[in-house]
Amino acid sequence: KEIAIIAAEPTKTMIFNEMNYMDNLCMGLSRRVSGVWKRNMRDSVRKEYGPVLGEEVFQIPVERLSERQKYQLVYTRVLLQKPKVVVCVQPFKGADLDHRVFVWKMMEMLLDKGMSVVILTINLADSMSLADRLIRIGKDGILEEVNREDFGSLSIAAPWLSLYRTQ
């Protein structure tokens, strides 16, 4: 309830083709809201999110959704869960620029709703646009923390080389 995880490549790992769109969307609500499988509750979810997601998605089998529609499904499912923290595992893996911008917008939507977003990534540049701080963690815990206002002090010649060093 407190933490949600969005796995790497969530359109392949977090969508269940044997379930319809509404079932995929509401499955995370079942722990938080009783009666989520009742028609009136599902109608309420559709009324609230249909204009944002597009009414057509409720009629399309999930395996035929576009990549963008699948990402919206996953991120909106998490939004409905209302966790305090969302952990995104390599959210930009294999993504082109348009896809990255779309995922940033989806994460900003979570931030706007008051959720904390933790981005686990190998590429630091992937997270800097959203981050308010960078934390380098080693086997013994936190090794270094850099606040947003200090991002400018990070080296551009060899990007963040010091952050990769082991102690």
What are these regions (language model features)?
Residues V89, A95-D96:
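ABC-family nucleotide-binding domains
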Residues R100-K113:
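Helical segment within the ABC ATPase nucleotide-binding domain
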Residues K1-V33:
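ABC ATPase nucleotide-binding domain signature region
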Residues S127-S129:
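A short, surface-exposed alpha-helical micro-motif characterized by mixed small hydrophobic
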Residues M115-L120:
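Conserved H-loop
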Residues G141-R165:
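Conserved beta-strand-loop-alpha-helix hinge in the C-terminal portion
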Residues Y75:
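Hydrophobic anchor residue at the start of the ABC signature
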